[in-house]
Amino acid sequence: MILDVIVEDKLKRLPEHKKRISEEEMTRLAIESQRVSHSFYDALAKDGLSIISEFKKASPSHGNMNNKITLEKRIKQYGESADAISCLTEEDHFKGSTEYLKQIRQMTDLPIIRKDFIIDPYQVYEAKVIGADAVLLIAAILDDSRFKELYDLAYSLGLDVLCEVHNEEEMQRMLNLDVKIIGINNRNLKTFEVDLDTTKKLADMVTPEMRKAGKLLVSESGVADTDDIKVLAKSGADALLIGTVLMEAPKPEELISEFKEVYNAERK
């Protein structure tokens, strides 16, 4: 399964990172950091639909992005209408880099989430140091004990956590852990097939009381056009994380505005 391969490759990559900057040094840099995070949670909690625009060079399901626009221009475009930015830092399958996130941090005050396959505390400390405001934790690759360890560490460093699920079992685990932000991935990371109904099916497990208490839902993956937006509008998600269609759009800022308009109209 592709997910297993990605995690195996990540395990091989980690020693390279730790060789460049030791675990002790990375921990010290993160703890001593004076950087105040931009609230990822607040960006998603505001009225109306929030959109997390993703920067990535490639993906296993799509291949290389059809995009010759520079990083600087793309982030400037995102900044006109997006609410947060997701940056892929996974090297082998998404052609990401921590350097991209560092550069994006210098270009925008929007909250940035480090999107990677995080399995080690080092990666959380590293996220803080390179300028991230939040990290992605994927339920499918972490048991509850490890998940809670990384989750608590992130919040202790002032980082928000997007907790990703794909099925009922993973959703129930996150509800049991009482996490703040749940990301429902419409793409099965084991087969890479997409089903937009996944968001509504899993969102129905979150009670109105939980929503009133502040639990946020993000729908991830699979958006290609306004028809998809209309489907997801029925799910009740607070935010959408959108990657490929925005990366390949010549004017993503206009597409983001259109998506928000359609979504909010459907919700009325």
Curated annotation (Swiss-Prot):
<dbReference type="InterPro" id="IPR001468">
    <property type="entry name" value="Indole-3-GlycerolPSynthase_CS"/>
</dbReference>
<dbReference type="InterPro" id="IPR011060">
    <property type="entry name" value="RibuloseP-bd_barrel"/>
</dbReference>
<keyword id="KW-0456">Lyase</keyword>
<keyword id="KW-0210">Decarboxylase</keyword>
<comment type="pathway">
    <text>Amino-acid biosynthesis; L-tryptophan biosynthesis; L-tryptophan from chorismate: step 4/5.</text>
</comment>
<dbReference type="GO" id="GO:0000162">
    <property type="term" value="P:L-tryptophan biosynthetic process"/>
</dbReference>
<dbReference type="InterPro" id="IPR045186">
    <property type="entry name" value="Indole-3-glycerol_P_synth"/>
</dbReference>
<comment type="similarity">
    <text>Belongs to the TrpC family.</text>
</comment>
<dbReference type="GO" id="GO:0004425">
    <property type="term" value="F:indole-3-glycerol-phosphate synthase activity"/>
</dbReference>
<dbReference type="Pfam" id="PF00218">
    <property type="entry name" value="IGPS"/>
</dbReference>
<dbReference type="InterPro" id="IPR013785">
    <property type="entry name" value="Aldolase_TIM"/>
</dbReference>
<protein>
    <recommendedName>
        <fullName>Indole-3-glycerol phosphate synthase</fullName>
        <ecNumber>4.1.1.48</ecNumber>
    </recommendedName>
</protein>
<keyword id="KW-0057">Aromatic amino acid biosynthesis</keyword>
<dbReference type="GO" id="GO:0004640">
    <property type="term" value="F:phosphoribosylanthranilate isomerase activity"/>
</dbReference>
<keyword id="KW-0822">Tryptophan biosynthesis</keyword>
<dbReference type="InterPro" id="IPR013798">
    <property type="entry name" value="Indole-3-glycerol_P_synth_dom"/>
</dbReference>
<keyword id="KW-0028">Amino-acid biosynthesis</keyword>
